[in-house]
Amino acid sequence: MTISSAHPETEPKWWKEATIYQIYPASFKDSNNDGWGDMKGIASKLEYIKELGADAIWISPFYDSPQDDMGYDIANYEKVWPTYGTNEDCFALIEKTHKLGMKFITDLVINHCSSEHEWFKESRSSKTNPKRDWFFWRPPKGYDAEGKPIPPNNWRSYFGGSAWTFDEKTQEFYLRLFCSTQPDLNWENEDCRKAIYESAVGYWLDHGVDGFRIDVGSLYSKVAGLPDAPVIDENSKWQPSDPFTMNGPRIHEFHQEMNKFIRNRVKDGREIMTVGEMQHATDETKRLYTSASRHELSELFNFSHTDVGTSPKFRQNLIPYELKDWKVALAELFRYVNGTDCWSTIYLENHDQPRSITRFGDDSPKNRVISGKLLSVLLVSLSGTLYVYQGQELGEINFKNWPIEKYEDVEVRNNYDAIKEEHGENSKEMKRFLEAIALISRDHARTPMQWSREEPNAGFSGPNAKPWFYLNESFREGINAEDESKDPNSVLNFWKEALRFRKAHKDITVYGYDFEFIDLDNKKLFSFTKKYDNKTLFAALNFSSDSIDFTIPNNSSSFKLEFGNYPRSEVDASSRTLKPWEGRIYISE
């Protein structure tokens, strides 16, 4: 199949056409029965990933770490966390991945490091240490009536409370936008940047990785002076820092500099991809990040569609939304690419999101499978690089009715403590928070992978091991890889079929452009068209438990039904009525 680059102005690339499978190493596969996933466990399941239809794996942080934030607090960028294995285990995993014809992408967490990293230990040792300026140190704004130091500004940590931690030794605060053991690195310091590139990027390029997923890549450039943030949450003394930390004044310069380092470092001709987690950005800013001619990022993740239904003031507050809101937000992932040399991504799940069937489908026993397949139809029909998160291909759902004590996520625990302190355990704020985490907590994605219905650990660990985190009880209900592999009607086998369809029609599924909504205001129907050369793809997707009617664009008879989530024997291709949670893809040539 020849991919034309006439429109949009894009070149075919391996990373554009790839389906990338994300692995959360702690929860994927435990090879030695210590309760934690590991490198050898991942290696043992690479064939499973290949058979699914994935072209690359992205592994969340596996570096040496105190694990205060599940490895996103890195103490040594050049060492594998011993619980996950050795560096040699990782190098062997990279080699096996390549032998199977897949690419290897690793996580790049360089907005912050761990407070156990040698860089920070040196920095905090004294005010005159040469690495003092590698982090953000500031004196207290003052002292309260009890003599406690007041943080330098009103910025809120993403994990609740102030974004500053007081260090007794030097009597100054350090900035940490995440948890107290994740000090932010000061990218204004050139020596700091060079050390980051060499240790976190260069070391792994030298060992054969094919790309980097760049964690919170929009936060490196803080506004000079670190001023107070505007008050948008009247119920808290801590405010979102986004206006002064996100997409800051030097952010594009920093990404261009790092991209140049990558290009200069790789000598064997392999093309390295970078995908930035850029949270929120205008279309123009997204184009600046991902324009091929600017040499910053290959593509980016945007959060608009996963944040629908959550308050901009505080994500753990749910607000009403309709299907139209989600449709518009989802299109923000890729519409800015049209007619440019930019690129983007398609995803519904990752390690920071709940299970998509619970969030956007219907996880009831009656509709879990069919709505899970519908979400698969949607994803394979959209343009951009497709990402699938471990367990998504099984149709995993959120765990149910867990008490707060079972949650592991530092974001949940810190926000719970902050709300309890500020408003009380029985407050309406706490009730809203608990309702929200039942739907959107990151922990829903982090339970151990469900390989079988083997008791008590679903094949993740041996029966005598104690996994690091509780299992989702749904493995006993058939939501596991072993049972689903034997069931031709399972979500797993449907995903294999869906990815084959996407590859067979990659010209219009991956590279399609001129996306247009049809019947945007419809509260149950998600339908659209997009084009590639002389082809048009039309998708009609029923996001409800009712049968609904739809119309083919221009009533054209040239559209042929190519793919859907109901068995073809049950579908009348000429029918204009969709069954509950039915999705169809038509193509006209």
Swiss-Prot record:
Matching SMART domains: Aamy (SM00642)
Top enzyme class: hydrolase
Enzyme Commission number(s) of this protein: 3.2.1.10
Record-marked site positions (Transition state stabilizer): 352
Keywords, sorted A to Z: Glycosidase, Hydrolase, Maltose metabolism
GO-annotated molecular function: alpha-1,4-glucosidase activity; alpha-amylase activity; glucan 1,4-alpha-maltotriohydrolase activity; oligo-1,6-glucosidase activity; sucrose alpha-glucosidase activity
Gene Ontology BP annotations: disaccharide catabolic process; maltose catabolic process; sucrose catabolic process
Record family assignment: Belongs to the glycosyl hydrolase 13 family.
Described function: Alpha-glucosidase with specificity for isomaltase, methyl-alpha-glucoside, and palatinose.
Protein name: Oligo-1,6-glucosidase IMA2
Gene, per the UniProt record: IMA2
